[in-house]
Amino acid sequence: MKNLFKVALLVVSFATLSFITAEKKEINIVIDAGHGGHDLGATHEEALEKSIVVEVTKKIQSLNTDADIKIHVTRTEDHFLSLQERANFINKIKPDLVISLHTNSNKNSTTTGIETFYSDKSIAALKSEEMANKLSEVIAKNIPLNNRGVKKAPFWILSKSEVPAVIVEMGFISNQNDKDYLTNEKGQNEIAKTILEFIEGLK
């Protein structure tokens, strides 16, 4: 009887361990820091899009402490990458999701807020739309800027990525309030933590 009990206990323990192991899921994410090098992106006064996005990218990478979340980045330095080079990088890794970071600008300085984009031209359009909506919800909850919601656009990096991909336009540097937030350490940290919270929720 004792031996039978030991066998039963071993079977239960193995089944429990197998369940826990099955539940663990490693995910791969590409964070694409837009522009770089001679490509400044949007500019306003001293604010440069290429610099803001790379700072947020590095913060996402450094804040991640989950061994099951692999963060791959297109750049952490100020150098130029063509759209084709970015797409090649993404399609070689084949991540679960691409999040491309950008900032916006408008001639009307009162235009403000964060926009999340996906492309219906992508082979992963449905999943991209789903991811864009989920990310936008987390952004609306955590970031104290106007949330302009999810939009559809045939941006090259979204259309040419063979995996789900979204663009986050993190705010308008042509708007003083948005610019102050985006160029501030606290604001950049909040955005990085928000994106990481969303990524953690994908597990």
Language model region names:
Residues 4-8, 12-26:
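Bacterial Sec-dependent signal peptides at the C-terminal "C-region" and cleavage site
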Residues 23-133, 141:
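Catalytic-core regions of hydrolytic enzymes
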Residues 30, 41, 72, 100, ...:
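Active-site-adjacent mobile loop/cap segments within catalytic or ligand-binding domains
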Residues 63, 138, 198, 202:
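Short alpha-helical functional segments enriched in proximate histidine and acidic residues
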Residues 141-147:
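Short secondary-structure junctions
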